[in-house]
Amino acid sequence: MEKQSIRGKRRARKFALQALYQWLMSGTDLHEIEAQFRTINNMDKVDGEYFCRLLYGIPTHVEALEASLLPYLDREINALNPIELTVLRIGSFELFHCPEIPYKVILDESVSLTKEFGSQEGYRYVNGVLNNLAKQVRSVEVSLDNE
């Protein structure tokens, strides 16, 4: 993958985290949130298609994504820090719906987002949950990587 494509996806995740956090906290319509982000932010270097894939895909699959996370959580979904919950939703969506992205990249990007926006030690929790989910969802990829 080209560096520009990698950076564009990274920026898309960052904006998607902020947009999905806004959706979680306010319930604002996703189309309105997208319009706000495109108006307020310089999205020239953002992979806009990937941003929309996350922005619209995660709410569409939110119940299934959260159900997939439950076995690996030590608390109820509603007790999670909203940023960490949003990062977990993004990471789980990517694990299930973006097979073109290696699971290690998904984990690394999720950890980076949590370090930047989440609580001080939240990245460890996010990494542990998504690593366990990856072992189930991407079992072949994980086992090949561990050989």
UniProtKB/Swiss-Prot annotation:
Alphabetical GO biological process terms: DNA-templated transcription termination; transcription antitermination
Keywords of this entry: RNA-binding, Transcription, Transcription antitermination, Transcription regulation
UniProt keyword annotation of Ribosomal protein present: no
Domain of life: Bacteria
TM region positions: none
Keyword Transcription: yes
SUPFAM superfamilies xrefs: NusB-like
Gene Ontology CC: one annotated term: cytosol
GO MF entry, a single one: RNA binding
InterPro entries membership: NusB-like_sf (IPR035926), NusB_fam (IPR011605), NusB_RsmB_TIM44 (IPR006027)
Role played: Involved in transcription antitermination. Required for transcription of ribosomal RNA (rRNA) genes. Binds specifically to the boxA antiterminator sequence of the ribosomal RNA (rrn) operons.
Family of the protein in this entry: Belongs to the NusB family.
Name of this protein: Transcription antitermination protein NusB
Source organism of this protein record: Legionella pneumophila (strain Corby)
Gene: nusB
